[in-house]
């Protein structure tokens, strides 16, 4: 809300009243500022005077403290002066007079005193020589005149010395009973205090309330105020410094350090604050002068200006009411009022010219004299532009009417063409939508027509066809690959079963060998036991030798058969290992193919985003075309919907691919584990074969020994000792054979267990390959797709070329 709304109407309608209100307001502000300034100056002057007095008081107290210190030092120096000590008695007074001249002007007397007799032996005042100093009742401070060593200085309070108030400084000469007394005039010291304010004076008061130093002799030794109960004394001794006002006096107090004295500086408040009254009077005079000047300004200038402004206000109201011919008198005034009246006359002439030109333009009288006059400013430029525009518009109106019909016809033709274009785009968008829906349902055999008049739609169709071609080829390769994996897994399973059966046969053979070896060992032991009866049972030995020879031949045959079967098992394990390696490579290739499918789906997402941008561009074109672009708007909505559905379809495909990739990853992991187990089984079988070879060798050796025994049966009667030795050897070999046969049996059982685990892993791989093939069966592809042969041409970049190369490599591997 404007400030003027709070001003009464009677004031707002009169400039004189406004001026009066402003002047009164200014006067009130001046008075307020003056009062504030007076108070501020008064406070500032008061604080300044207080500060000056306090500073002076503190400085005087410090100076007095320094003066006392100097006098103590001087007294101590005099007590140690050899000239005074060594001077003859008759010359001591002269020496003292010489020394006192070097002291300050306050020094009133210098005495040389004998403390034993209390006698003044020499003095600068000859009248007191021979007197006792106790006759002056010197009020020594502290414990009296008691020296504790050379160099001590004792001071006194104020006392009267021959009519002069003084204070004494005393110091004892080292090694004697003599001392030096110096009397200082406190009146002279009081006259040294400054008097920077008229009527001011300074006094030094001790703790008892007695004036010790003052310029007024009558005040010295008198009680100050209420004596020791005076508040200013207590305050001065407890605080360092301060200012107080009492009895019309401004009193500054400061403690004299090292003493029990307070220095008090007094100044009459009327004199101390005299500057405050002068400043206040000057400010009042300034305010009165300013108010009087403002009043004179209103009377002299306001009345004349108000009359002229009232007249000009009436003329302005007439012009505002439309009376632009109202009389405005000329004036000879050269001030602002005269300039204002002349400006009003110029405005009147300006408005008259503008009105004449407006009338001529309204009547379309382009030859009127008023139009020849110049009208300055933007209004003149607008009138001139209006003149030429109106004249040109009238000339162009007929031409516009002729072209309007032609424009209408062209607009109708454009609308028909736009509708046809919208219909074509809508049809193509529907085809794209159906194709993408089929692809989302798994049918990858659908293709779009690329023969269209619209480059953008043709590019989209070409890109989508290329995408579907690559996706179909990839799915086809994965289907074939998963089928090959399943077939390879079945073949590996069959081979593993054969290996398992062979291993079982090997295990049985080894167990038979172990049983024969144990039986052979028992026979050999029996032979060894019966050797003591060999002479009586030679025929039984021969029979046993024949039986042992037969068993040994059987063991050799079984060992050779086991060796052959073990070699077959190794060859079969090698074949299984090679097949497992090929299967692992194929599963890893399948994992790479699934990664490529994921990248293709990403490409589909990019195309969907481009489709969204195409829909946005179509919407913009439709907005520009207005009603003729309604078809574009419909097509844009369809394309936008198609883009959204494509995105959803790619998300479903991504989910399906993720499941397939998980299955593929598990299959690859299982195959790798199976490969590790096959390697372990291969090592076990190799160890078993080596053990069997050793067993066969041992059996052949045992068989040779048995045949030797059988051949030498006829000679046993004569060579019993040789037979015993050979039987022992056969027994040792039989023990080794038995142990190795048992090891071979255990190894064969372990091999059988490993082959069982391998068979189970292969069966799991076959099941996972079957699941993968079933997942991929959701996609419909062409059996004769070119990509399956590794010869597909594509234009999607290095990624698709890499996929084709990998497929060709896989195809070559399978052909091999």
Swiss-Prot record:
It is found in: Cell membrane. PROSITE patterns: CHEMOTAXIS_TRANSDUC_2, HAMP. SUPFAM superfamilies: HAMP domain-like (SSF158472), Methyl-accepting chemotaxis protein (MCP) signaling domain (SSF58104). InterPro entries: Chemotax_Me-accpt_rcpt (IPR004090), HAMP_dom (IPR003660), MCPsignal_dom (IPR004089). GO terms for biological process: chemotaxis; signal transduction. Belongs to the methyl-accepting chemotaxis (MCP) protein family. This is Transducer protein Htr18. Potentially involved in chemo- or phototactic signal transduction. It comes from Halobacterium salinarum (strain ATCC 29341 / DSM 671 / R1). Residues 495-731 form the Methyl-accepting transducer domain. SMART domains: HAMP, MA. Methylated by CheR. GO terms for molecular function: transmembrane signaling receptor activity. Residues 405-418, 804-816 have a biased composition (Basic and acidic residues).
